[in-house]
Amino acid sequence: MRKDSLSKSGKRRGFVSVVSPFYNETDIIVTAATRMIESLNRGFADWEFILVDDGSTDDSLDKLKGCISELGNPKIKVLSYQPNMGRCRALKTGIDAASADIIITTEADLSWGEDIVERLHDALADYPDRDFVIASPHLAEGGFNEVPFSRVCLSQGGNRLIGWFFDSGVSMHTGMTRAYRRSVIQPLKITSYDKEFHLEVLLKLRTLGYRVAEIPTVLSWEVRRSKGTIQPKSNLFTRRMMRTISSHLLFLAIGQPMRYFGAVSVITMLTAIGFVFAGLWNFVTGGVAANFILMAGLLALFSVVFLGFSVVFTQLRELSAASWSDGKGSAADHMPVRAWQLEKISK
């Protein structure tokens, strides 16, 4: 038995599934896939590598198929569909196709670390009390390397802002590099395949009582920078990120209604009480109190409305939570997905 197929606890690493989506990655797909395969061969006795082509319009898929043919390894599976539907759709498609008890989702180019798959696997396999693990560059021992400063600021600011609104217990809410137990993630019903996907998964798993942990990691874009595949920041990018953050916060408000609508209700009612005291003071001192009392009444009415929203949305969430665990295959929505493995490609 190879020592590198053992975890730090000395246990033999079991079968693992790695899911990596890609879209128009013609410049790096072969290098990225090769690096991941080498890492899996070093760290695991048995594995499967699922690459999901999210409707690429360049020759990424053809290059990848040629690479797999040369490597001659049947452990690699390629899923493909058209048209492009977003990375999150690709992730759920790959997750639903995975067969190992532990499923790891990450970029194929190992930008989260050469040993990220082993570390995520061990953080889950060696700790039975954990249900999923998130890799975070925002922890004390994590960081960024060759990542544009603007993206670092957006990641740190966005995740910190979400953390203020969402009592998740983690520092990284939006990253895709995670490890899940198959019994936890495959049945999860997903309704959003935009940027809210990662947040929806986190929110639903936490609501259902599943336990999460984090490991520190350094996110490096050295390979992407060397290949010139990093897109420069633009005003459009900034606006898109602001829309993403806004939609994340709206999603959290709906997902945790008592926390937000309830808080607004309390604040509004306290303000109404303040207007009542102001009106009484005006009345005692000979001033006009009617305007203050009228405003207090309106605020009290709004407070009751917000409280009603929180109760209704909480009940709706509790009712819908019962159906969150029957969602395997929901990502595909019966869309045609083509699958390739070595024996099919080499014909």
Locations of the language-model features?
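Donor nucleotide-sugar binding loop of glycosyltransferases
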Residues: 25-28, 56, 87, 113
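Short beta-strand/loop segment that forms part of the nucleotide-sugar
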Residues: 45-55, 77-80
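Short helix-capping segments at alpha-helix termini
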Residues: 40-45, 69-75, 126-128
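A conserved acidic beta->alpha catalytic loop
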Residues: 53-62, 110
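Hydrophobic helical membrane-anchoring modules
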Residues: 1-14, 196, 200-347
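Acidic helix N-cap motif at the loop->helix transition within catalytic regions
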Residues: 27-31, 58-67
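Acceptor/aglycone-binding surface of glycosyltransferases and processive sugar-polymer synthases
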Residues: 75, 81-97, 102-105, 114-195, ...
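N-proximal low-complexity "stem/linker" segments adjacent to membrane-targeting elements
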Residues: 1-38
